[in-house]
A protein has these predicted regions:
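Glycine-rich, proline-tolerant flexible connector loops at the mouths of alpha/beta enzymes
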Residues: 39-52
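Metal-dependent phosphodiesterase/phospholipase catalytic core, i.e.
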Residues: 49-156, 172-182, 195
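Hydrophobic faces of well-ordered beta-strands that scaffold small-molecule active sites
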Residues: 5-7, 33-35, 100-102, 126-128, ...
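The start of beta-strands in P-loop NTPase/AAA+ ATPase cores
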Residues: 3, 27-31, 44, 98, ...
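Catalytic domains of carbohydrate-active enzymes, especially glycoside hydrolases
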Residues: 22-39, 169-177
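C-terminal active-site rim and adjoining tail of enzyme catalytic domains
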Residues: 81, 152, 157-243
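Long, acidic (Asp/Glu-rich), low-complexity accessory segments flanking structured domains
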Residues: 1-13, 76
Length: 243
């Protein structure tokens, strides 16, 4: 076994983040797709990270615009904002093995995502990540089988019952804790394993950090998934390490 690679917002080190081209690049590089999703004013679920954007001197709030209004905007990077459904449609041929990880802006975006997932029979291939336990609890009430991942706040430097509500995570059947790659990442990884959870790590973008995360092994467990802007570089290092 080796860690699963997610292209962070696609292969965002090479393409414009959260676009079909970025997702295609990630898949071509042997990775799954990580994306950020939110709802427009007309309740269309789109892949877009920030709750607002600026073009020139104009400031726009995504939830106050319809899909058509967003697509009519001339983004400085010329991006085309995709619907989540369009992403699934683009990768139908990969649906048996391709994994997705979605960050949701708010709980209703998560609920809309669950509906699309069910309609496309993709529940087992998809994980929904969030930092807010009340959001994950809300989603669990709507789906007993959804794969939910808890991303911890970046200021947390120890994994224990004193710093996290681990009892509630277990009650919600959340099996994965997602952490940022930072100075004490190895200690956090060990504490996550000791508490019976799987570990995902995000923001793994330098070769130094890639090697560090790949080499992490504790009590027979390795990091289960890694998020990176550069899936090709990580994939090559993993091929060399796990051959």
């Amino acid at each position: 076994m080796k860690p699963y690679i997610f292209g962070h917002r696609g292969a965002s080190g090479y393409e414009i983040e959260n676009t079909i081209s970025a997702y295609k690049k990630a898949v071509d590089m042997g990775a799954g797709i990580e994306a950020d999703v939110q709802l427009t004013q007309d309740n269309k679920l789109i892949c877009f990270h920030d709750p607002f954007f600026v073009i020139g001197s104009d400031y726009y709030v995504v939830r106050k615009l319809t899909l058509n209004e967003i697509r009519e905007k001339n983004f400085e990077d010329n991006r085309k904002v995709p619907l989540v459904k369009e992403v699934f449609d683009n990768f139908k041929e990969n649906s048996t093995y391709l994994r997705y990880s979605f960050d949701i802006l708010e709980k209703n975006a998560g609920l809309a995502l669950l509906t699309i997932i069910r309609n496309n029979l993709l529940l087992q291939n998809i994980e929904i990540t969030d930092r807010r336990l009340y959001v994950l609890s809300f989603l669990r009430k709507h789906s007993k089988k959804a794969n939910l991942v808890y991303t911890i706040a970046e200021h947390i430097n120890k994994i224990s019952d004193k710093t996290l509500n681990l009892k509630r995570l277990r009650k919600l059947d959340i099996k994965v804790i997602n952490i940022r790659c930072k100075r004490n990442v190895e200690d956090l990884f060990k504490e996550i394993i000791d508490n019976g959870f799987k570990c995902y790590i995000w923001d793994v973008n330098t070769k130094l950090n890639m090697r560090k995360v790949i080499n992490m092994n504790y009590s027979g467990e390795i990091v289960s998934a890694i998020y990176t802007d550069y899936p090709d570089k990580l994939n090559q290092l993993m091929e060399d390490h796990f051959k």
